[in-house]
């Protein structure tokens, strides 16, 4: 198996996956990211607390949702924003054509060689799931958010807690998880001691 592992923003997407969210809620992205970039220093100074600069933006999204700036923002809504992303030319065609290329090659057929595409991103997993590339992707690693009842709207939910994160360091962990095939075999984890022959995808 040949695994092709992609980043998302500015790699597949022309811009950032949060852009349609800011546009929908009339939030200035420049001001938002300036606020986010100041948070690590602020929390260290005020509370002597270190935060992860790669994922602190998730806290800010949750804060905005609770304050009503991102009114009604939940996982379903995040997924809907995936359909509004603008991909670079050739995306998602490259995923389909690369699979077809190997599937139609006699030598690849003989040795059962195939290609799988993965996305590892510090962005929202739900946004990726709602995008046009998802049907071509074997699996994704991204940030996941937990919902809670929306205090501002009865019967609705909003993003409320952080469930899972990927940052620039744990992207390496994701690569090892793909290597060992933990997404295909629940009995295997990233710390499992597997020989090279036992690993689903070789480096």
Regions found by a protein language model. Give the residues of each.
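Conserved Lys-Pro-Asp/Glu-containing loop-to-beta segment of HAD-superfamily phosphomonoesterases
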Residues: 166-203
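Alpha-helical substrate-recognition element adjacent to the catalytic core
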Residues: 1-152
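Histidine/lysine/aspartate-rich catalytic loop segments that bind and position anionic ligands
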Residues: 136-168, 174-177
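Noncatalytic linker/hinge segments flanking ATPase motor cores
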Residues: 44-52, 159-165, 182-189
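Generic serine detector
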Residues: 83, 98, 121, 131-132, ...
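Conserved phosphate-coordination/catalytic loops
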Residues: 81, 85-89, 164-173
């Amino acid at each position: 198996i040949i695994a092709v592992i992609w980043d998302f923003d500015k790699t597949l997407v022309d811009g950032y996956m949060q852009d349609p969210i800011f546009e929908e809620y009339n939030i200035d992205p420049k001001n938002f990211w300036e606020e986010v970039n100041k948070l690590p220093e602020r929390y260290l100074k005020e509370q002597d607390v270190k935060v992860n600069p790669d994922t602190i933006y998730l806290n800010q999204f949750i804060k905005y949702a609770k304050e009503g700036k991102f009114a009604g923002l939940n996982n379903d809504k995040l997924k809907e924003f995936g359909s509004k992303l603008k991909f670079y030319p050739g995306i998602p065609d490259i995923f389909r054509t690369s699979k077809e290329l190997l599937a139609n090659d006699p030598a690849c057929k003989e040795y059962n060689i195939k290609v799988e595409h993965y996305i590892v991103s510090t962005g929202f997993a739900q946004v990726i799931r709602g995008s046009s590339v998802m049907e071509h992707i074997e699996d994704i690693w991204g940030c996941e958010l937990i919902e809670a009842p929306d205090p501002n709207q009865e019967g609705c939910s909003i993003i409320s807690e952080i469930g899972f994160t990927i940052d620039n360091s744990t992207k390496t962990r994701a690569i090892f998880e793909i290597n060992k095939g933990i997404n295909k075999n629940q009995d295997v984890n990233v710390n499992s001691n597997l020989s090279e022959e036992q690993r689903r995808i070789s480096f």
